């Protein structure tokens, strides 16, 4: 079953130098249980692609296409629904994991922390 899908995703930044395409026509899918790694040179759009998933891009970024999470279009979601998804179904660990993750705590505990803060569940289920 497809968990995450990009359909013709495009991100263009607009600034003093005009329009700059950062992501051009990405089509890919990730099924439940699969792992996806995105690699490339500095400035090729990896972070832009990841930030687009949770709509964390700056206001001057124009995003078109579709990003489907469990069949639901993240780009069409209202802010309330998006906020709920950010805490329960999707999250991001930014580049430089040494600054994002605590080296003296298990990763599972760190990933589970926001779930425990926002959901009624046990630590075992959250991890």
Predicted regions and their residues:
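ABC transporter nucleotide-binding domains
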Residues: 1-127
């Amino acid at each position: 079953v497809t968990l995450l899908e990009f359909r013709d995703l495009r991100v263009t930044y607009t600034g003093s130098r005009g329009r700059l395409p950062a992501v051009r026509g990405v089509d890919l899918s990730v099924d439940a249980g699969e792992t996806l790694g995105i690699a490339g040179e500095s400035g090729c759009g990896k972070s832009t692609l990841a930030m687009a998933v949770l709509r964390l891009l700056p206001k001057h970024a124009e995003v078109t296409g579709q990003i489907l999470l469990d069949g639901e279009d993240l780009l069409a979601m209202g802010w309330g629904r998006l906020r709920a998804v950010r805490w329960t179904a999707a999250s991001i660990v930014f580049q430089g994991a040494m600054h994002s993750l605590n080296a003296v705590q298990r990763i599972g505990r760190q990933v589970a922390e926001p779930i425990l803060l926002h959901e009624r569940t046990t630590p075992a289920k959250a991890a």
